UniProtKB/Swiss-Prot annotation:
Pfam families: GcvP2_C, GDC-P. The lineage of its organism: Bacteria, Bacillati, Cyanobacteriota, Cyanophyceae, Synechococcales. HAMAP family: GcvP. SUPFAM superfamilies: PLP-dependent transferases. GO terms for biological process: glycine decarboxylation via glycine cleavage system. It comes from Prochlorococcus marinus (strain MIT 9313). This is Glycine dehydrogenase (decarboxylating). It catalyses: N(6)-[(R)-lipoyl]-L-lysyl-[glycine-cleavage complex H protein] + glycine + H(+) = N(6)-[(R)-S(8)-aminomethyldihydrolipoyl]-L-lysyl-[glycine-cleavage complex H protein] + CO2. The keyword Oxidoreductase applies. Keywords: Oxidoreductase, Pyridoxal phosphate. The keyword Zinc-finger does not apply. GO terms for cellular component: cytosol; glycine cleavage complex. The gene is gcvP.
Length: 962
C-alpha cells in the first residue's frame, strides 16, 4: 500500500518503542473504548485495488459524461488552458502540494504568483486593494454584502439592493447568507432602486446575466448619497475593454477568473476575486499578499494584515474564509502573464466581434433582438425556441434555456454566450441552426476584418494603458515563461522536498494517480448547468462519494456542495438552525464553543445568526464538563448547538465525547462536529454513531485533495437522518433536501472538478486501507511525541499517556531560559529543510505537529533529529556558549546569498548556519529570503506590483526579486 509511508517492519519498530505489540492493541489504547469499533464497520466501499484498476473504473465513469460545446454562459465559459500552465502548474506537485504561505521565507514563489494575481485584479478594476482569491463569485458577492453591512453604522440600515440581472447562482448564495443576518434583499432593475437610510449596499452586475452592458455611474452615485456602498460583479474578460469599475465609483468589485485559463470542471474549483478601496483593507475577506523587506533589506513578500483574519478575530471577524483558491489564482495569473494585455484584449475583441456578427444574423433571420450594448451574450425570446434547442443539441451545442430551469422543449427563448474557444466556424454552425429553426436561408455576413469597439459606443471604455508591469510583457516565449515558472517554484518548499508537519492540516500524500483524472476532458470541460443526461458520470461520482462518506462517518446523508471547510461549517450550522425553525423553535440561537476551537468556528456562528457562548477547557485540554453543563443549562431554552472538534484541537481523544453529546441533546441542542481531525478516526469510530448530528469533512485533508498552496478545498457535510431535508439546494439543479437551506456555493456540487481525487483515493484504499491509514497516522504522531518528549514537553496527552494524530510541543520554557520565541524555532527549521509545524495554535508559544500516515520512518526521524539538534542549539544559549542575540536561531533563516557573502560577521560559522546536519550537504533547500519584517509590511502596505510610472517616481519601491 504505497500511500502509507512506514513499512510493516518500521511500524513494528515504532510499536516496540511505544511498548505495544501490534497496531490493534495500540489503537485500543488511544481511542476511548466506548466509541471504538474493534472491527471494521460494514462499508459500501469496494475492496481496495491498484491504481491501474481504479483508473480504468474511473475512465468508464468519465465516459458517461457526454461533453458538448456549451454556450450557456452564466459565469462559466470555455477557455484554453495553455499547455505549459497545465503541465508545469496544475499537474506539478511542487505547486499543488504546498500549504498556505504562512512561512513566507520558504513560500516566495507562489507569493509572487499571487502578487501578480492581485496586480491583475487591481489593474482590471482600478481598485487599489485586491485579495489573493475567494471561493467563487457567489461567495465573493456575499462577502461584499457582509462587509457593507458590517461597515454601516446606521442601526436602521438592513436593505441590500440587488440588480435583477445578477447571476442566478449568485442571488441564491446571497439569499442563503442574508437571512440569518437579518438582511432584506430587494431584487429590481437598478433604475428603479428605492434608496433611503435603510439601504446599506447595492450589488450591480456588469455585464448583466442577459449580456447587457450599461454605465452604472448614476446608480452608484445614488447609493453613495444615502451612505451605501456599491459592489459591482464584473466579467474580467469584458473588463479588459471597459473602463475600470473604480472610474464608475464602485467601492467593491467581485467576480471570477474562471475564463482566464481555468477549466469549467462542472462548476469548480475557480478563483474568485475581491477588490476594494484602501480604507476597507482591514475588512477584506481571505488572504492578502503584501510586500515587505527582509533582514538584509531586500524586498520580500508575505501575508499582510493577518490580525484581521478569522483565526485571530474569531467571533468579531467579518468573514470565516480560511482556505481560498490559490492554485487556480496562480493559474489565472500565469494566464495573464502568458497572454499579456494585448493578448487578453485580442481574445476579448474576438468574442465581441463574434457576438456582434451573431446579432446581425439574428436580425436578418427575423428573430426579435433588443438593440442594447452587449459583450459576449445574447438572449432571445421567441416561439422557435424549442426547435432551436433541438437543432442545437443535434449539432452538439448546449444553449441557455429560457426561462432558466425549464426543459428545452418548454423553452420560451434561448441564450448564447461566446467565449475564448469560439470561432468563425462555430458562428456559422450557430447561424445554420437558427436559420433552420426559422425556416430561412443562412445569412451571409460580411467579414468585418479587424474588429473595432463600435459595438460598445456610448459606454466608457478603457483609455489608459494597463498591465504595464514588466512581468506581463517579459515572458512572451515559452522558453522564458517555462524558466520563470521554474524559478518561482524553486523558491517554495512543498511535499516534494519533505514532510510538512502542520498540526490540524493533514499534509498527506497526494498521489499522482489521484490527480491525473482531473485533467480528463470528460471531467474538466463540462458546464455545471449542462443537461442532466450529459452529466451521468458526475452523477455516479457524486453518488459514490455521498454513499462512501455517509458510511465512513456513520451518518445518513451528505452534501458535497460546500467548497471549503469554512463553507461546510456554515452549511452545517444553517442546517441545524433550519431544523430548529421547522419545529417552531426560532428562539434557539446560542452556540456553545470550547475556548480551544479554531477561530473559524466562532466566526461561522455569527454568520449563521447565532450567539457564541464560550466553554472552558480543563488542565488536560478537554472540554470542561462542569462548565459545559452549567452553560447548557443556563441557555437551555435558547441552545441551538455545540461546535466541537474531535479529536480535540489539543490533539487528544476526549474520553467523554458521548457524554458531551448526550448533555447537549438533553437540553434540546444539536452537536456540530468539526471534521478537521477526521484522519484520526476513519475505520475506528464514527461521529454519527457516538452522538454528533452534523460533521463537515475536509477532503483537502483526510481525503487527499492537495492544499494547492492555500486552496482549493472541499468541505462536504454529513448529517443525521432528521437533518437531511435541510441540506443545501440550488436554483438550477436538483440537489439538496425538500426544505433545503438554499445554495451555500455558486455551483450545485461545489468544486466538482476535483472530486475524482477523493474518489481515486477511496477506491484504491478500500475500507481496510483507510483503517490502516488512520492507525499509522496515530502511530506516527505518538512516535514523534515519544522521541521528542525528552527534549520538549508534550503539552497534552490522552488516556494511557498517548496523543491522537498530532501533538503539541511546549516551547514556552525556551523564552524564559534562552530568550527565544516560537518563531525563532520555526525559522531555524527552514535551515534544516523543514516547514514549521503549526505555530502558537491552539496554545501560544507552542507548535502542533501532525506527521500523517504518508511519511516514512526515515523522514520522521529526520524531523526528530532536526528538532533535537535545535534543542542543543538552545542549550548552548542557555549555558552562555553562544550569544543570546546573535546566534543561528535569532538570525534564521539563512539564505544562499547571506552564507556566500564576502563579509561574514556572525559569531558562528557559515557551515553552522547553512548545514546544521551533515546530510544537508547532499541535498539542501535554501530559503529564498531572510527573516521578513512583518510589521514594516503592514505599516507600508503594498499589495500589487508598482507600475512603470510609480517605479520611476519612487526609488524606494522595488519589484519582487524574480
Amino acid at each position: 500500500m504505497r500511500h502509507i509511508g512506514p513499512s510493516l517492519e518500521d511500524q513494528q519498530q515504532m510499536l516496540l518503542e511505544l511498548g505495544h505489540r501490534d497496531l490493534q492493541s495500540f489503537v485500543a489504547a488511544v481511542v476511548p473504548p466506548d466509541i471504538l469499533e474493534t472491527t471494521a464497520p460494514s462499508s459500501s466501499l469496494p475492496e481496495g485495488c491498484g491504481e491501474v484498476q481504479a483508473m480504468e473504473e474511473l475512465r468508464l465513469i468519465a465516459a458517461a459524461n457526454r461533453v458538448r460545446r456549451s454556450l450557456i454562459g452564466l459565469g462559466y465559459y470555455g477557455t484554453a488552458t495553455p499547455a505549459l500552465i497545465q503541465r508545469q502548474v496544475l499537474e506539478n506537485p511542487a505547486w499543488y502540494t504546498a500549504y498556505t504561505p504562512y512561512q513566507a521565507e520558504i513560500s516566495q514563489g507562489r507569493l509572487e504568483a499571487l502578487f501578480n494575481f492581485q496586480t491583475l485584479i487591481s489593474e482590471l478594476t482600478g481598485l487599489p486593494i485586491a485579495n489573493a482569491s475567494l471561493l467563487d463569485e457567489g461567495t465573493a458577492a456575499a462577502e461584499a454584502m457582509s462587509l457593507s453591512f458590517a461597515i454601516c453604522k446606521r442601526p436602521a440600515a438592513h436593505r441590500f439592493l440587488v440588480d435583477a440581472e445578477v447571476l442566478p447562482q449568485t442571488l441564491a448564495v446571497l439569499r442563503t447568507r442574508a437571512e440569518p443576518l437579518g438582511i432584506d434583499l430587494e431584487v429590481a432593475e437598478p433604475m428603479t432602486f428605492q434608496f433611503d437610510a435603510e439601504v446599506f449596499g447595492v450589488l450591480l452586475q456588469l455585464p448583466g446575466r442577459s449580456g447587457r452592458l450599461w454605465d452604472p455611474t448614476t446608480s452608484i452615485q445614488a447609493a453613495h448619497e444615502v451612505g451605501a456602498l456599491a459592489t459591482v460583479a464584473i466579467d474580467p474578460l469584458a473588463q479588459v475593454l471597459l473602463a475600470p469599475v473604480a472610474e464608475f465609483g464602485a467601492d467593491i468589485a467581485v467576480g471570477s477568473v474562471q475564463r482566464f485559463g481555468v477549466p469549467m470542471g462542472f462548476g469548480g474549483p475557480h478563483a474568485a476575486f475581491f477588490a476594494t478601496l484602501e480604507i476597507f483593507k482591514r475588512q477584506v475577506p481571505g488572504r492578502l499578499v503584501g510586500q515587505s523587506v527582509d533582514a538584509e533589506g531586500q524586498p520580500a513578500l508575505r501575508l499582510a494584515l493577518q490580525t484581521r483574519e478569522q483565526h485571530i478575530r474569531r467571533d468579531k471577524a467579518t468573514s470565516n474564509i480560511c482556505t481560498a483558491q490559490v492554485l487556480l489564482a496562480v493559474m489565472a495569473s500565469f494566464y495573464a502573464v502568458h497572454h499579456g494585455p494585448d493578448g487578453l484584449a485580442a481574445i476579448a475583441r474576438r468574442v465581441l466581434r463574434l457576438r456582434a456578427q451573431l446579432e446581425r444574423g439574428l436580425h436578418q433571420l427575423g428573430y426579435p433582438v433588443q438593440s442594447i450594448a452587449r459583450f459576449d451574450t445574447i438572449e432571445v425570446i421567441c416561439r422557435e425556441a424549442p426547435a432551436v434547442h433541438q437543432a442545437a443539441a443535434l449539432a452538439g451545442f448546449n444553449l441557455r434555456v429560457l426561462p432558466l430551469g425549464v426543459a428545452p422543449e418548454a423553452a420560451h427563448g434561448f441564450g448564447i454566450s461566446f467565449d475564448e474557444l469560439s470561432t468563425d466556424q462555430e458562428l456559422k454552425s450557430i447561424l445554420q441552426i437558427l436559420a433552420e429553426a426559422a425556416g430561412q436561408p443562412v445569412p451571409v455576413l460580411e467579414d468585418p476584418g479587424n474588429p473595432h469597439l463600435e459595438e460598445l459606443v456610448g459606454l466608457p471604455l478603457r483609455q489608459r494603458p494597463w498591465l504595464q508591469q514588466q512581468v506581463f510583457h517579459r515572458y512572451r516565449s515559452e522558453t522564458e515563461l517555462l524558466r520563470y515558472l521554474q524559478r518561482l517554484v524553486g523558491r517554495d518548499l512543498s511535499l516534494v522536498h519533505g514532510m510538512i508537519p502542520l498540526g490540524s492540516c493533514t499534509m498527506k500524500l497526494n498521489a499522482a494517480a489521484e490527480l491525473i483524472p482531473i485533467s480528463w476532458r470528460e471531467f474538466a470541460a463540462l458546464h455545471p448547468f449542462a443537461p442532466q443526461d450529459q452529466c451521468q458520470g458526475y452523477q455516479r461520482l457524486v453518488q459514490d462519494l455521498e454513499h462512501w462518506f455517509a458510511d465512513i462517518t456513520g451518518f445518513a446523508g451528505v452534501s458535497l456542495q460546500p467548497n471549503a471547510g469554512s463553507q461546510g461549517e456554515l452549511a452545517g450550522l444553517l442546517v441545524i438552525r433550519a431544523w430548529h425553525h421547522s419545529r417552531g423553535e426560532q428562539q434557539r440561537d446560542v452556540c456553545l464553543i470550547p475556548t480551544s476551537a479554531h477561530g473559524t468556528n466562532p466566526a461561522t456562528c455569527v454568520m449563521a445568526g447565532l450567539r457564541v457562548v464560550p466553554v472552558a477547557c480543563d488542565a488536560d485540554g478537554n472540554v470542561d464538563l462542569n462548565d459545559l453543563a452549567s452553560k447548557a443549562e443556563a441557555h437551555a431554552p435558547q441552545l441551538a448547538a455545540l461546535m466541537v472538534t474531535y479529536p480535540s484541537t489539543h490533539g487528544v481523544f476526549e474520553p467523554q465525547i458521548r457524554e458531551i453529546c448526550e448533555l447537549v441533546h438533553g437540553h434540546g441542542g444539536q452537536v456540530y462536529l468539526d471534521g478537521a481531525n477526521l484522519n484520526a478516526q476513519i475505520g475506528f469510530c464514527r461521529p454519527g454513531t457516538y452522538g454528533a448530528d452534523v460533521c463537515h469533512i475536509n477532503l483537502h485533508k483526510t481525503f487527499c485533495i492537495p492544499h494547492g498552496g492555500g486552496g482549493p478545498g472541499v468541505g462536504p457535510i454529513a448529517v443525521s437522518a432528521h437533518l437531511m431535508p435541510f441540506l443545501p439546494g440550488h436554483p438550477l439543479a436538483a440537489c439538496g433536501g425538500e426544505q433545503g437551506i438554499g445554495a451555500i456555493s455558486a455551483a450545485p456540487w461545489g468544486s466538482a472538478g476535483i472530486l475524482p481525487i477523493s474518489w481515486m483515493y477511496l477506491r484504491m484504499m478500500g475500507a481496510e486501507g483507510l483503517r490502516q491509514a488512520s492507525a499509522v497516522a496515530l502511530l506516527s504522531a505518538n512516535y514523534l511525541a515519544h522521541r521528542l518528549h525528552p527534549h520538549y514537553p508534550v503539552l497534552f496527552r490522552g488516556q494511557a499517556g498517548l496523543v491522537a494524530h498530532e501533538c503539541i510541543l511546549d516551547l514556552r520554557p525556551l523564552k524564559r531560559s534562552a530568550g527565544l520565541e516560537v518563531d525563532d524555532i520555526a525559522k531555524r527549521l527552514m535551515d534544516y529543510g523543514f516547514h514549521a509545524p503549526t505555530v502558537s495554535w491552539p496554545v501560544a508559544g507552542t507548535v502542533m505537529v501532525e506527521p500523517t500516515e504518508s511519511e516514512s520512518l526515515e523522514e520522521l526521524n529526520r524531523f526528530c533529529d532536526a528538532m533535537i539538534a535545535i534543542r542543543e542549539e538552545t542549550a548552548a544559549i542557555e549555558s552562555g556558549q553562544i550569544d543570546p542575540q546573535n546566534n543561528p536561531l535569532r538570525r534564521a533563516p539563512h539564505t544562499l546569498a547571506a552564507v556566500t557573502a564576502e563579509v561574514w560577521d556572525r559569531p558562528y560559522s557559515r557551515a553552522e548556519a547553512a548545514f546544521p546536519l551533515a546530510e544537508q550537504r547532499q541535498s539542501k533547500f535554501w530559503p529564498a529570503v531572510s527573516r521578513i519584517d512583518n510589521a514594516y509590511g503592514d505599516r507600508n502596505l503594498l499589495c500589487s506590483c508598482p507600475s512603470v510610472e510609480e517605479l520611476a517616481d519612487n526609488a524606494v519601491l522595488k519589484p519582487p526579486l524574480v
